[in-house]
Amino acid sequence: LGLSVARSWDGGIMFDTGDGIIEVFDDGESPLPQGNIRHFAFATEDVDACVLAVRKAGYEVFVEPKDIEIQSDPKFPARIAFCRGPLGEEIEFFCEK
């Protein structure tokens, strides 16, 4: 596809699409049934507001908002949170700091 690498780390890589990011990583788990998605992420300006909306809609938040730093090249400081979608998929909200 000709995408440039935005960041990489052991077991993962982010590709720059021009107006977004595609993250690919090895999660070490068994394959999902055809048509299922295990994880996807949304970039947002306000992770905490997204979590409030998720809770209000009645969905499970299983990683509360927190600040992290992915040891990628270059390093990636971010605020993240995870919830479960209606089909059990993991939905990540993140904001680069």
Task: List each language-model region with its residue ranges.
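Short secondary-structure boundary/capping segments
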Residues: V5, I13-M14, P31-L32, S72-D73
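Vicinal oxygen chelate
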Residues: I13-D16, L32-K97
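Short, charged/polar, Gly/Pro-enriched secondary-structure boundary elements
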Residues: I21-V24, L32, E89
